Amino acid sequence: RNELEKNGMQDIVIMSYAAKYASSFYGPFRDAIKAQKLSQIKDKKTYQMNTANSDEAMHEIALDLQEGADMVIIKPGMPYLDVIYRAKKEFQIPTFAYQVSGEYSMLLSVAGEKRNQELILESIFSFKRAGADGILSYFTPFLLKNL
């Protein structure tokens, strides 16, 4: 933040990736891009958060806010609705949910188009109920067409 402001970029908004969990829900994306072959790092758990720990996310968000972040993203979203809720309540900042490829694949795996549409909307509404100000989702084209 300080460097941006020193260079006359006061209007730049910083979105923190403070709460990125070492989740199995990233699997479909990693498989699609063959991430294991491209990366020397085989275990993302060395630098992503423990999936059982929500307090670490609050600590990391607080640090990023002290460093000038304006908003935060929680990734993946659905398994961490509690983290979205806590971040919004504790810090009162714009909070975003990222619905990752595994969440997308899981919802699409349910048979029947009508059922899928209901599940997609229910998942999006759950982010809003948890306090998300914005949602990044592979379902965005569907949502733009149907909402």
Say what each PLM segment does.
Residues 1-147:
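Alpha/beta enzyme core
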